[in-house]
């Protein structure tokens, strides 16, 4: 048998013999194949003939250009392996197929089912991987064809001759410059993962939906609360310019021993009691400017005010924490250190207020957010002795909903801003409870004349 001059995809093709009907015909084919392999040396031909004669059946002569198609019983291990490889690749090809491919579009290299546009050509996964590995590992110089580069490359023969397969990849237009090295491939994979994660976050955001902002009715409520706070907040935004620092020597010499190892500096305590009455008055005025509060029975108003007064005063002090001087400004006028506030009567409560101030400094709260926090604290329906519990709870829900929508409107860049801010309500409630316990001990240890009447009225049961 001699090579046919017919070409396939630009490469010389070999005629494929038909199935061998009997052994006599098989031996004729052996002779034909020997003639076709005249390129081999005499010893190679003798070795080939000897191997063929050692089997009762004709063993497949493995050419990359031509494969004898024998009966199933005559297929050797190598042909079985090729078939298994083909089946595996065929299964892979049944996966995702891009929408831009026509139905049953074939690989331009081997004719297998194409899976996409790879390195400028429409190819199957097998040829894509072969081309990529060849370029990345610089394997093509080591490829060699035993049959003068005349192999036909199809989905059955593609694994038989690497040189002819690679040449056909180049011939059909696969671009070597598009194959990435390890570093570029890792960078591309990282970029793909980042884009995938970005899309996932965007889809998650869409699934959550657009965060609602305040309605017109809620804006009216927010405006009322904000105006009430601004009108009753001493010094407003000018507190830093108008504050006065408590002298350093005050609050450093404890005189009276308080329970639980705490000590009280009576001079510092005296300074604090002078500003406590106007501070309490401002909290009361804030509450009276809220229509919802004024609609409640007088008894409930008193209970709510007594319950929230220390909490609101602590909040107003905490939002005026100054990291540079490490002080809190009380009632917008007196800047005190942690030690001074502690020795002045508050003891461990001062630590909680300072810690709250340090935490809130990163929240960058505006007047409206502080005002809404105060309204939420004021309308706490769990205060003992309340008559209109459901109404107060409903009022608090209204403030909370408007508050949440306002937070959405503000678009803070702090992660989980809203739940973190709500946790501060819990912290303030704890401060109020600790102060109530501290006050009972202070009444016993400090002279009664040092306590202003309004202070006693608010904090006594």
Curated annotation (Swiss-Prot):
Binding site for 3,3',5-triiodo-L-thyronine: 282, 331
Region entry Interaction with NR2F6, spans: 244-461
Residues engaged in binding 3,3',5-triiodo-L-thyronine 1: 435
Name by which UniProt lists this protein: Thyroid hormone receptor beta
Residues of the DNA-binding region: 107-181
Single GO MF descriptor: chromatin DNA binding
One of the record's GO cellular component terms: nucleus
Role played: Nuclear hormone receptor that can act as a repressor or activator of transcription. High affinity receptor for thyroid hormones, including triiodothyronine and thyroxine.
Sites where the protein binds L-thyroxine: 282, 331, 435
GO annotation, biological process: cell differentiation; cellular response to thyroid hormone stimulus; DNA-templated transcription; female courtship behavior; mRNA transcription by RNA polymerase II; negative regulation of female receptivity; negative regulation of transcription by RNA polymerase II; positive regulation of thyroid hormone receptor signaling pathway
Comment on protein domains: Composed of three domains: a modulating N-terminal domain, a DNA-binding domain and a C-terminal ligand-binding domain.
Main subcellular location: nucleus
Annotated region (Modulating), positions in chain: 1-106
Binding site for Zn(2+) 2: 145, 151, 161, 164
Phenotypic consequence of residue 243 to Q: Impairs hormone binding and ligand-dependent conformational changes
Localization (cell): Nucleus
